[in-house]
Amino acid sequence: MNGDPGESGHIPGARVVAAYKGGSQDIPSSADRVEQYAAEIRAKYGVEIVPDIATLLTKVDAVLLESGDGRAHLSQARPVIAAHKPLFIDKPLASTLEDAREIARLAAEAHVPWFSSSSLRFGAIGASMKFPDVTGVFTWGPGPFEPHHYLDLSWYAVHPIEVLYTIMGRGCVSVTRTAGEFGDVIVGRWADGRLGTVNAVRPYSDYGVVVIRGREVVESRPKASAAVDYRALVVEMVKFFQTGAPPVPNEETLEMFAFMDAAQKSKEQGGKAVSLR
C-alpha cells in the first residue's frame, strides 16, 4: 500500500499513515521483532509511530489490528469500535470463543464493520479449491501451540481451519479431536452429513487440501509458497475499508471459533464428540 505505485505489487486505494507498536513480552516472536518492524516502516514507508491507540484513532480512517496475540485483541478493539472505525483483525480474532463473541457484540451494537481472516482464504489454495459439489475436505498445516492461548488451535492451526471453512462453509454441528505428539486430527461433522478434517502438524509443515467431489478427489497445488501470499488478503482489506462490506461473513468467523472451542473440549475429554455451542 505504501510502496511505489509503479511497483508490480503495489495496492492502490489506501495508505498506512500511523501505527502503534503494542507487542507482547511473553511471546518472543512479538517482543523480539516489534522494535525492528517499527523502525523499518517508519524509515522505509514514512509511517508515524504513535504512543497509544487513542492517538492513532485521531489520525486514521480505518484500523488494521495486526497484533499476533489473540489475548490482546478484545481490549485493543474496544477503543477502535467506540471510535466507529472500520476494523480488520488479523488471526487469531481472539484466544477464546467468549472474547470473539464479545468483539462481534460490541461491533454490532456500534454498527462498526469488521472482519478477520487468515491469508490462506484468499491465497492459491483457498481460491482454487472451492467447488459447488464438495462432499468432504481434508486440510493440513502447521499446528504449534502457545501455552497462553486457551484455544490452542487458534495460534497457528487456525490457518488450515480457515481453509476448511472457505471450502465447506458454515453448518458444523460437532467436533472430535485426536491429539498426538506430532499433530492433532480434528474432524467436524456438518449438519448435511459432510465431514471436514484438519491435520494440525507439529512442529511445522506445508499447507494443503484434498477435496472430495463424489467419485473425484482433487488435491491442491502448490502446497506452500503461493498459499501464504499476503497480497490477496490486503486487496480484500482495502475493498472492505472502501465499501464497509466484509469479504468473510462475521457469522462464519464466529463459527470457526465455536469449532475450535468444541475441538478444545474434545481434547480435554479424551477425544469425545462435542457439539458446537
Task: Locate the predicted segments by residue.
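A general structural signal for well-ordered alpha-helical segments in protein cores
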Residues: A38, P160-I161, Y230, V234, ...
